[in-house]
Regions:
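Gram-negative outer-membrane beta-barrel transporters
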Residues: 11, 106-108, 127, 131-218, ...
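Transmembrane beta-strands of outer-membrane beta-barrel pores
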Residues: 9-15, 51-57, 64-66, 93, ...
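Signature of Gram-negative outer-membrane beta-barrel scaffolds
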Residues: 1-42, 177
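Repeated loop/turn-to-beta-strand initiation elements of outer-membrane beta-barrel proteins
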Residues: 1-3, 44-47, 95-100, 154-157, ...
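Membrane-embedded beta-barrel scaffold of Gram-negative outer-membrane proteins
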Residues: 47-48, 76-141, 150, 162, ...
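C-terminal beta-signal and adjacent terminal beta-strands/loops
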Residues: 108-110, 115, 157, 211-215, ...
Length: 291
């Protein structure tokens, strides 16, 4: 059995002043570290348990167009701290034809940094912007599984699966969002694919990646739809050169990756959802030389 420990300490200082006469000098002292136990079995299986604490420093929201009545409550945000617990396993099955990795995790986020949208003038869409604030607490837990399989000498496959549950907790300024999932945290994500190499110079690869629906933002309750993308690669390799014909999103799936909710259309400037969509089908050629 192996035991490892790591520690980190940081002191962060900053100076802020602007044309609205806001001026302050925040100082944050942050610490983190990791403790892990690793058990190696005789059959090549490794199991581990870890406890880690990390942090993300605070900062400022710039370019918000805030008026003179605004306070530094909107301008500055505090550090976020994360405590993470993990149990994991790595093993090889069927005479090393399958490589399996699995992780169970639970994370507690304190002073969670959340990205929200604001519009200082409801009748002026040019005042729409994003800012970071602190929610009191957030919780993440889930499962990750990765498998690589050698089916035969020329055919291999992979499967990646993620299950994630998240929750916003104890957010005093937005109690309506307490208990809701965090933004951009789909409950299910996956990828699977096949790689076929009929000769030492040629290969064909196809993969499918998908996500379930997720909330666009921590400032409104609009969600994306689930989607699956299909990608294809056809390649030729010789003398350190790699020639590849590829296609991304070959079925031209229409899907959204971001969502913005604000008033933009006169005369009433009613809050409306505007979505940014992912890349459509695109095809290309790549040439690479490996030294």
């Amino acid at each position: 059995m192996k035991f490892s420990i790591g520690l980190r300490w940081e002191e962060w200082e900053a100076d802020y002043s602007d044309s609205l006469q806001e001026s302050f000098n925040p100082t944050d002292k942050m610490s983190g570290g990791k403790i892990s136990l690793i058990k190696s079995m005789t059959n090549g299986t490794n199991m581990y348990a870890s406890l880690a604490k990390g942090y993300k420093q605070g900062g400022f929201n710039l370019g918000l167009g805030l008026d003179a009545n605004s306070t530094n409550q909107n301008l500055a945000y505090d550090p976020e701290f994360l405590t993470n617990y993990e149990l994991g396993i790595n093993t090889k099955l069927l005479d090393s034809k399958i490589n399996f990795n699995g992780v169970l995790f639970y994370s507690n986020r304190e002073d969670q940094q959340v990205l929200i949208s604001t519009q200082t003038d409801p009748s002026d869409p040019n005042t729409f912007s994003f800012l970071t604030q602190n929610a009191a607490e957030g919780v993440n837990h889930g499962l990750e599984i990765n498998m690589d399989m050698d089916i035969n000498q020329s055919l291999s496959a992979f499967v990646n699966l993620g299950i994630l549950k998240t929750e916003i907790k104890n957010w005093q300024s937005r109690q309506d969002l307490e208990g809701r999932a965090q933004a951009h945290a789909p409950e299910r994500s996956y990828a699977l694919g096949l790689n076929w190499a009929p000769t030492s110079h040629t290969y064909l690869a196809i993969d499918f990646t998908g996500k379930s629906s997720f909330y666009y933002s921590d400032s409104h309750n609009n969600k994306s739809k689930s989607y699956v993308l299909t990608n294809l690669n056809l390649g030729y390799v010789k003398n350190n050169w790699n020639y590849e014909l590829w296609a991304r999103n070959i079925f031209d799936e229409y899907y959204s990756v971001r969502g913005f909710y604000f008033g933009n259309e006169a005369p009433n400037f009613i809050d409306t959802l505007y979505e940014r969509h992912g890349d459509p089908r695109h095809i290309g050629v790549s040439i690479r030389y490996d030294f």
